[in-house]
Amino acid sequence: MNVCYFRSLKMKKYYYLTILLIFFVPSSYAALDVTISQGKVEPTPIAITNFFGNSDKTVKGGEVLREIISNNLTNSGLFYTVDDDLYIQSDNLVDKVPRFEDWKIIKAQFLLSGDIKFIDNKYSVRIRLYDVFAGQEIKAVKMSIPNKDLLRRLGHKISDLVYERITGEGGYFDTRIVYISEVGPLNQRVKRLAIMDQDGHSDSHQFLTNGKNLVLTPRFAPNNQTITYMEYENNTPRVYIYNLKNGVREIVGDFPGMTFAPRFSPDSQKIVMSFSDPKTANTEIYLMDLNTRTINRLTNDPGIDTSPSFSPDGKKIV
């Protein structure tokens, strides 16, 4: 019994030593934990001076332009605007060379200056963009608009120019969003086709339909001048095209069955869509030329074919 007890203690001792070795002896095969953190992008500081005006209304217009440009660039996450209180030079820098050292002191990497005038019944705007550390002008543009209602659009265009010149990528500020607006109680929802600028500003919001009929699936044409969407009129779904220039709505076609999921071709000259045959209830894909209104059936099989879309080159349909 004593011998067995001694052997038992000895075995336990070896067992505990083995456990300790497993936990404390470094292994050449131990797992290597590597933590990769996301790179941090610091926003680029840009100074945007007041847009000087030659009258009360142009001064106000300049304030609107400056606010739009500043908000656009800041909201992109790639820029931040230097605080006005830090500005050392406050002159109109469109017609004179900036004192670049003054802008270096406040750590502005880029400087945007502009002015706005009302001449010959139109607003004329000039801008100059400077690279502060290089000490040189990198962009100069002159633009005009017929009325103040287009100031927001002009501000977005200037934002695009600045963004593209500095980043090398195309801007997206002069774009709009088409969507379905919903209001009212859950059992009586009113849905209207609506459009707004990409920044969602209330001044840019506009309803395109009156809400009497249900509207669905709006899509921009690549030319950004027309919208295709589906509307239930007299409980019948039809595809319509809305012209943003003149506000005219026209029906694409009065088809016998349900029509839905319209998409434009890259050149905005055709639409591909699907509609169902009321006799068979089968859904097929059709192609329509918007100039001639001719229709070609693309599919013919017992399955349900729907939600077509063009490839970027317009040669294929998925």
Language model feature labels by segment:
Residues 177, 227, 268-271, 314-318:
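Hydrophobic beta-strand positions that form the internal "hydrophobic ladder"
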Residues 30-44, 133-205:
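C-terminal/domain-edge helix-coil "capping" segments
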